[in-house]
Amino acid sequence: VNYRNHRKLCVIDGRVGFIGGMNIALRYVKGTARHAWRDTHLRVEGGVVYAIQRAFLIDWYFVDRTLITNRKYYPPMPAMPDTGTMAQVVMASPMMPWPEIMQGYVRILMEARSYVFMQTPYFMPTDPVLFALSTAAKAGVDVRLMLPRHADAFFTDWASRSFVSQVVEAGVKVFLYQEGFLHSKMLVCDDRVCTCGSTNIDF
């Protein structure tokens, strides 16, 4: 199961990219009879689109062993205003020797000074992430975690409860989204760092 592709990427003409938590199906837009669906997806332009396309092409080669070399798939990037904002695409895979995304979360939490707000549909953190969450909260950082009130899978709902209890005891403020199923995977820290993608906190 962990070898399936969980990425949700879209690149249009090599110029516009979409990345985040949304799957491609009507129920992920309109919800189901059981509950509405809440998600976060980003539309991006500029050099980061190349990085999203590279992630797709690596997956494509892994499956098909075909290199996409036609220049039409790599158009020149149009001039963009300098916003002073940096964007980076970080990938994770069971094939990779180092858990980059998990390590990124740990570093953000350990370097936070004011606040860290997080959303995830599934909360089964590794020991390093659990330690970083607890340490940040105990150090006075305003750590807030938003989860769905009801998970879409019974097992994950029950599995996450013991972890929730641990972080609440450490001072993390946990909020339960009531208006449907929260599928968003997002983190915001100190008005300076934001992450958005398809990685749940169940590394």
Predicted regions: what is each one?
Residues V1-F203:
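Charged, low-complexity intrinsically disordered terminal segments
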